[in-house]
Each structure stands twice: as C-alpha cells, then as structure tokens.
C-alpha cells in the first residue's frame, strides 16, 4: 500500500491547519475506541486518521462540528443560571435601597477581604 501524504489529504481539506486539527481529533477518537473506517495495515492512529481523510470515508463536516463542540468551554446551563440570578436581583428592589455610605463600606470590605483570601 502506498503511504498517505499530506498532499492527498489537502485535496479533501484545503487548509493544512484544519487538516492537522481534524486528523488529530480523529486519531484521539480512534485511541478512545472509535470504529475504524479503513484497514489498519499495522499503521498508527494518526496515519489511520489521515488515510480515512484521504479516502474520504469520514464526514468532514461532522468531524469538524464534533471537534468544535469539544473545544468549547461555555456551559450553557451555568450561563442560564447566572442570567436567571441577575434577573432575580433586578426584580428585587430591596438591594437598591442601600445608602451611599453602606455601598462604600460594602465595596471596601469586599476589596479588603479579597486581598486576604489571595495570600
């Protein structure tokens, strides 16, 4: 069997940087136990991933979307909870009745307490 080259893969994925990301992601998936789409032929996982890309046996867009979802660090559930908490605070007018002196004291105590916690 001929060795897979980057030129074979660049025809399928034109951006070399995207090719590296996709093939590395696929190789990690193979290491985690994903089913192989081509025969291994005693090749290592990165080579198998490149051969799968070159042979066009995997869905590039699906692989790209899965890669993006694994790289995202936003937890939508946490974001929704924070937004609900903010809306609840805005709906409660009791915290708006703080005097200027009380506000300054609260800010200073937060500032002073925050420095002690860091050390």
UniProtKB/Swiss-Prot annotation:
Q: State its Enzyme Commission number(s).
A: 2.7.7.6
Task: Provide this UniProt record's keywords sorted from A to Z.
Answer: DNA-directed RNA polymerase, Nucleotidyltransferase, Transcription, Transferase
SUPFAM superfamilies, alphabetized:
RPB6/omega subunit-like
GO biological process entries = DNA-templated transcription
Q: Does the keyword Nucleotidyltransferase apply?
A: yes
Can you tell which superkingdom this protein's organism belongs to?
Bacteria
Q: Give GO cellular component annotations, separated by semicolons.
A: DNA-directed RNA polymerase complex
Entry keyword annotation includes Nucleotidyltransferase? yes
| Enzyme class at the top of the EC tree | transferase
Q: Enumerate the GO terms in the molecular function aspect.
A: DNA binding; DNA-directed RNA polymerase activity
What reaction(s) does this enzyme catalyze?
A: RNA(n) + a ribonucleoside 5'-triphosphate = RNA(n+1) + diphosphate
UniProt function note? Promotes RNA polymerase assembly. Latches the N- and C-terminal regions of the beta' subunit thereby facilitating its interaction with the beta and alpha subunits.
- Similarity section: Belongs to the RNA polymerase subunit omega family.
| Subunit description | The RNAP catalytic core consists of 2 alpha, 1 beta, 1 beta' and 1 omega subunit. When a sigma factor is associated with the core the holoenzyme is formed, which can initiate transcription.
| Protein name, entry field | DNA-directed RNA polymerase subunit omega
List the source organism: Caulobacter vibrioides (strain NA1000 / CB15N) (Caulobacter crescentus)
């Amino acid at each position: 069997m001929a060795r897979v080259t980057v030129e074979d893969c660049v025809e399928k994925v034109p951006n070399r940087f995207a090719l590296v990301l996709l093939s590395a992601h696929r190789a990690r998936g193979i290491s985690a136990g994903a089913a192989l789409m081509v025969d291994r032929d005693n090749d290592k996982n990165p080579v198998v991933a490149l051969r799968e890309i070159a042979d066009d046996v995997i869905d590039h867009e699906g692989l790209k979307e899965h890669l993006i979802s694994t790289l995202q660090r936003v937890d939508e559930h946490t974001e929704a909870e924070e937004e609900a908490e903010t809306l609840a605070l805005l709906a409660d007018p009791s915290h708006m009745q703080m005097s200027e002196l009380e506000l300054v004291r609260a800010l200073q105590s937060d500032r002073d307490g925050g420095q002690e916690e860091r050390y």
